[in-house]
């Protein structure tokens, strides 16, 4: 039976019922709905709505219900209730009879779903931080194992300057650290409890909302009932953080796809995260990475969809807000899966250090070193830049790297160039010179790895 049937003389059309009902997706809020109900039972007992005996009877029944569904909350889907609130109430009534009908006193589904969603989002933030940390651990482990793997760094997908695979790994560690921080910040703003705000104007019972908030794991009750039942900022913040993180994961995946390609051959992905072709027996496709890259669109879409849904809503609650759920549920599952698969991809990755070094020696990625060499000889950088550009054109015409040019050839471009230029042009010199904080100098990279291990508690 619907929770609101008294006003209506006709039953809802079956098509509308399916269109309106949300149990098929909001069943995921079952544990939060039960926990919120336990907290609410205590709150209304404090103002005399329930006796202490009734309170205890309800709490026992709610805890029993929680224990029954916790191993597999999907069993709820066998039911035909309108939503998770209706389902919990109906099951409670089955257990305690008419006493179960007293629980909703002073409460609206508007503040009920608001607190359910906020509690669910808090749980998700913690779980996702754990998944981020796991991927960061894998990145640090991979970096530590590949500190000597010199490879080309790219701008515009063209070889630019030499880096190491370890430095590449640590770049993604830093991106994920910002994602972790964003979740921490978002979690702080989830510490206000909307329960007790009623439908929009507040509850008619003088409950202690701050005590209720603390019972439910919040810091304090919200300050404005209109805002409380209308607020979905916590959902938007999770979706926003997920979207930014999925940008990072998509770029991570794209890099690995490129490095794994036959054109690069910098590394090989494990058989555990690749698949074959139904037609071409030689293929080994980077499907795990391609799916991470592809699934980013689902998460972006959830954020865009909810922003669009909320932007024109008047205060307070509107049924449009039911559309916050499917997007966030799917986005959080997708983000979590991508973080887990990203870590799996790194487990058995095999970097071809000979090939990465060979590639780093190509493409004139030491040209900047030659320009810096000229600057050290007293030539203004802009002039040095032009001189080196001409030298590169000459080397390209000879199909030789810069370091293969003779001193006499170098002197065609400027007389200050001498024998001391050759050590400067080596890959090792290119790396060593980048010794400022954050640079690719091997010692700086080692320091970054050690700092990350301390941060991760490794």
From Swiss-Prot:
Disulfide bonds: none
Cellular component, GO annotation: cytosol
Gene Ontology MF terms in the entry: argininosuccinate lyase activity
Pfam families per UniProt: ASL_C2, Lyase_1
Keyword hit for Heme: no
Listed EC numbers: 4.3.2.1
Subcellular compartments: Cytoplasm
Organism: Actinobacillus pleuropneumoniae serotype 3 (strain JL03)
Annotated HAMAP family: Arg_succ_lyase
Pathway connected to this protein: Amino-acid biosynthesis; L-arginine biosynthesis; L-arginine from L-ornithine and carbamoyl phosphate: step 3/3
Keywords for the protein's UniProt record, in alphabetical order: Amino-acid biosynthesis, Arginine biosynthesis, Cytoplasm, Lyase
Gene3D superfamilies according to UniProt: Fumarase/aspartase (C-terminal domain), Fumarase/aspartase (Central domain), Fumarase/aspartase (N-terminal domain)
Gene that this sequence comes from: argH
EC main group: lyase
Higher taxonomy: Bacteria, Pseudomonadati, Pseudomonadota, Gammaproteobacteria, Pasteurellales
Catalytic activity, as annotated: 2-(N(omega)-L-arginino)succinate = fumarate + L-arginine
PROSITE patterns named in the record: FUMARATE_LYASES
Similarity-based family: Belongs to the lyase 1 family. Argininosuccinate lyase subfamily.
GO biological process: arginine biosynthetic process via ornithine; L-arginine biosynthetic process
Name of the protein described by the UniProt record: Argininosuccinate lyase
